[in-house]
Structures are given as C-alpha cells and as structure tokens.
Amino acid sequence: MPRWIFAFILPCLLLSLGVLIQAQAAERELVILTTFSREPLLPLVEEFSRRYQGIEVQIIHRRAQSSVQLLNKSYIQNIDLVLSSSPYLMQNLAQSGKLAALPEPMQTPEWLKPYALPMTEHVATIGYSGAGLVWNQDYLKTHQLPEPKQFSDLAKPVYFGHVTMSTPARSGTTQMMVESILAKYGWQKGWEILLRVGANLATASARSFGVSDYIANGQFAVGPTIDSYALILGRKLDYVQFVYDESFTLMPTYVAQIRQNHNDQYAKAFIELLMSNAVQTNMEGNDFAKHSVQDQSLVNERFTRLPMGSIIRREECLNDLFDLAITKHLPQLKDTLLAVLEAKEQFARRPSVLAKIEQIERTVFTMPISEQEVDALAIQIAPNSALSEEQQAESAMLLAEKGHEWQMRLEKQLEQANQELKILLAEEAQ
C-alpha cells in the first residue's frame, strides 16, 4: 500500500476506533440526575455496583427547574435516569415526551395515588416520605422554648429568631409543604401562617437537607423537613427530635428512565433494583430513609391531599411569590415584626392603642396578591415544549413583569404598615 494512502487511512481508523471506544464506554456507564443530595443515594449505588461490576455510576445533583433546563438542551444525551420527589420535574419530562414507558408492575400503587402524579405510566414510585418538624431538644431547653406540634406553631412570637427552613425555589419538598399549608388553611390564612413563620426565621437555608444540619449543630431550634433527613440524624443524635405534621402532604419518590435511541439495560436494571424486595424491605433502614411502597403504616386520610395539576402548573409563580414576600424581604419582615412585638408589649395595658397595633400587624401578614392572579399567570406562562424560543422568552418576560408588579405591591404594603406604626407611636409619645 502506498505510504500516502496509509497516512490518509490511519487517522480515519483511529477516529473510528475512538468513537467506538467512547460508545462502548457510554454503554458501561449509568448517569443519574437527581434532586436529592448525593450521600443518601450511595448505599443504592454501592448495591448496584456490587451486582453489575464494571459499570460506572455518576450522580448529577440539580434542583427541579435546573433539571428541566438541563434536559431541554439538545446536546445532553448521556443522562439515563431521573430520581426525584418533584412532581413538577417528572410531569414536565413526561409531557415533553422525554421519558420511556415503564411496565405496569413499576407504576404507583393504588393506595398512594391520591398523593402522587396524575400521570404515572412513565414514572415509577419507589417510596415516599412524610414531613414534619425537626428540633434540637437541648436548644429548646436552653432557650426555654416549648416543643412544637405542627408547622403553624412556628408562627408564634416565642419562636422569633429560632426557626430555619428552605425555600420552595430551592427545594421541591419545601414547595410541597408550602402548597400543603395553602391547601389546608386556604390562601389568605395559609399565607398569614407562612408570612409569620417567615418573620420568625433566623435564616433561610439554601438546601432542604441544610435545615436538619443547622438544627443538629445547635445553630437554630426548629424547622420543617421531610422525615428522611431528620430520621437519619436522629439515629446518631438523641437530642434531635422529629414529629410528623399531617398539615403536610405525603411525598412520593419517583424514578423515570430517559427515552434513548438505544436500549439502556442498566437504567432498567437500576429501576428493578429499587423496586426489588431486597431494597424495599430495607429502604427505611439505610441512608436513603424512605418508606417503602410495600409499607402503608404512615398513610391515613388526615394528611393533606393536593390538587396536583394546579400546583405543578403554578410552581414557578408560587416560588417567585414566596421569594418576593419572604426570602428577599427577610430583614425588613423581621424588623417589622420585632417593632410590632415591642409596641404590643409597651401598650399591653392600653386596649385602644393595642387594637390599632394589632390592625397594623394584620396588614403586615396579609398577602395582597390573590390566588386567582397567581393561577391566571400560571396558565399564561405554562411550560410547553411546542413553544418557540421567542414564545418562551415572552413567557419569561411576562413572569418578570408580573413579579416586579407583585414586588411593588408587597413593598408598599410593608412600608405603609411601618409608617402607620411610627405615626401611632409618635402620637402616643406626646
């Protein structure tokens, strides 16, 4: 063979060999996208690796909306599975045709369906969590605080500066808790509770599992969390206590397989492992700490049930509203509550003045944006894979414009309440 022909063919052969090796490597790899932290998944990954030696398992952690954005990128082809408690994420992927259909035995059991996604033929429910309050018993004793029984207790002034929680924008489970409070108490009463708890926050945790960590470390007293994070710490630290709150909904844990052009045998094998009797019977005992779909012991009708369709649709709007009302105004909200509490103590024996202060307090903790406004906006900007990039940009612009309007209304209301309190105190000082 002439040398020049060999010199031409050799790079092509090497390139083809490289592509073949890369493809074979991808076939020996399992990539899991999850909204959970990495550590609780390690026992499951280790068991899978023991059964399928030589298969590399990668875990990618993203929040729900970031996961949707990641999977919408056309060049992302290597993700095999999605593991999450976010109904928003799973419904979005199912509706956009990104998920492979699953066999009937892998679908949600009937008794859990009232708390689960309405669309389940592409999603397997592998377990579920309850939610409640976690607290540090030593901290409560030191600060002479009562043991809380339910989330609404955290709205009481006695917990001012002792509470932490995550935000719905950063945590899908927190979003479910917020929606649970709104469903149980109604929009206005629910927001009053949320705003009062918000004013009691020492800080908003950037991560949902950070709530239990903060409390275990003794930085704060109490906060809402799913049971798995609290129960794991409670096994190691006897001063960490947890109580279920039936104000919250039950939260299924979902797994789904991303639809690929090839038959991904290891993705199917991992789902089968999660559904196996060996894993299901030990799920609560390991660091994953979920209730098995074989275990109905926690389930009762008192847990709040959510209208899944509407809460999935309005997730982004509600997350923005929570951040505008609480997260971004946390210092002002706390200062206002402190001023109100001090004024109430000062005029505790002046009923006429106290009544005016309490009216100002009601204004502070009233949500000026109606549920109808939020739902109407959610319908307008509802995610749709058929939308062009221009239409998606228009939806984002509409959300930003509405968010600015909401922010102005919230700020005006808080400023008005502060001004009224200052005027009242000045008048009474004369």
What are these language model-derived features?
Residues 345-430:
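C-terminal non-catalytic accessory extensions
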Residues 134-139, 251-264, 282-283:
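A bilobed periplasmic-binding-protein/Venus flytrap-type ligand-binding module shared by bacterial periplasmic
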Residues 26-91, 364:
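Early extracytoplasmic/lumenal segment of secretory-pathway proteins
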Residues 88-92, 216, 221-239:
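A ligand-binding cleft/hinge motif common to bilobed small-molecule-binding domains
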Residues 193, 262-274, 282-285:
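Short amphipathic alpha-helical coupling segments at ligand-binding clamshell hinges
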Residues 295-348, 397-398, 402-416:
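An extracytoplasmic/periplasmic, membrane-proximal ligand-sensing/linker region
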Residues 163-166, 273-295:
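Periplasmic-binding protein-like
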Residues 42, 78-79, 85-205, 209-216:
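Extracytoplasmic ligand-binding site segments that recognize negatively charged/polar headgroups
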